[in-house]
A protein has these predicted regions:
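Active-site-adjacent betaalpha module
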Residues: 1-19, 50-58, 82-201, 216-218
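Generic enzyme active-site microenvironment
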Residues: 22, 26, 65, 159
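Early exported N-terminus immediately downstream of N-terminal targeting peptides
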Residues: 61-62, 67-82
Length: 218
């Protein structure tokens, strides 16, 4: 079992080489094309719930990285309550992916989970250098978060069956771009071994001559 501390950071394990980021899964789908996206998202929600369950068993911290709905005063309870109690489209999806008490939650004001948030500090605290990204939308907030993670030299796993966009074509294109440009592993979640992933080393970064070198830790 992972060791947790007594301080304010203790919602996640103190040492975890890999973390699971769930991006914009607490979602009301009350926007243009939201109904279309929801239809594609519901089966993906079941996959996300499955990977979260696997992560918990493997001692991998789960971090909800969620839009603040344009309200800086928003918090986790308000957002979840809105999605469950206000008759919004996203209620059946959110019920699949509800956070647990010991999950971490980061509110973001823009597309990337790293922009103006505490996400990088959380990941630094637990020592995660590899990230599993899942959520909505593959060609938008998942892509922007993946890009910023790559710029910070994180190793990326973005299971193709745990990401959804407004159309299947847009989703496939975004995944291929993340695989090609950001060196992401887009293997379906059923083919990934979270226990082995906990021991994955840092991403290789190209030096000025283009050759790979291992990034130093600490």
């Amino acid at each position: 079992m992972p060791i947790t501390s007594e301080d304010l950071h203790g919602n996640v394990p103190d040492t975890a080489a890999v973390a699971l980021l769930l991006i914009d899964v607490i979602n009301d789908f009350e926007f243009e094309n939201g109904e279309q996206l929801l239809e594609l998202a519901l089966p993906v929600g079941k996959q996300i719930a499955a990977v979260k369950s696997q992560a918990k068993k493997a001692g991998v911290p789960v971090v909800y990285v969620n839009d603040n709905f344009g309200k800086w005063q928003s918090d986790l309870n308000k957002i979840v309550s809105h999605c469950l109690n206000d008759g919004v489209r996203g209620e059946p999806f959110v019920k699949l992916v509800l956070p647990d008490e010991n999950d971490y939650f980061v509110l973001k004001p823009k597309h990337s989970g790293f922009y103006c948030t505490s996400l990088e500090l959380v990941l630094e605290h637990v020592g995660s250098r590899s990230l599993i990204l899942a959520g909505i939308a593959g060609n938008n907030c998942v892509l922007f978060t993946a890009n910023d993670a790559y710029m910070r030299d994180f190793k990326l796993f973005i299971p193709a069956d745990c990401v959804v966009s407004e159309t299947e074509e847009e989703n496939k294109y975004a995944l291929k771009q993340m695989e090609k440009v950001l060196k992401a592993d887009i293997t379906n979640i059923g083919e990934l071994d979270l226990e082995k992933m906990k021991n994955v080393g840092p991403r290789m970064s190209a030096d000025k001559h283009g050759s790979g070198r291992e990034l130093k830790q600490g």
